[in-house]
Amino acid sequence: MGQKGFYFDQTRCTGCRTCSVACSDLHNYAPDIVLRRVIEFEGGTWKVNTNGTCTQNVFAYYTSIGCNECENPVCVKACPTGAHHKRTEDGLVVIDTEKCIGCGMCAKACPYGSPVLDKAAMKMRKCDGCVARTSKGGMPVCVEACPERALEFGDIE
């Protein structure tokens, strides 16, 4: 097996955040633990014309961010207990919660903000590509939930 990962088609995403909610619901996380973030970028201006009508050039687009399943993940290198590791069978970066001490070193190292602290459990959490599902041939819940099919999961070429 090769490196697994996500493909995001920005042209299809409407910013509905169904992917994010599906992930949180599957794992029963508190509202402050978001492992798949949807970020909105917006800009442009409105102009009132002399005849009282408006002209606009506003825009908005979205990006859905989970874990990038990096080739050389700095979060793994930063983890002092070895709880963060990259699986050899599929390249997914996961956290062994038995080893995790919730120190946050992985979160400080990750340039994408993937690991977050679960304050109730005092453990770090991150998108793991729904490894319990994908290792049995299924798809991550965010991929299945997306109504616009903006997310895909599979081998990275």
Task: Please annotate each region the language model reported.
Residues 1-157:
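Non-ligating segments of multi-cofactor redox enzymes
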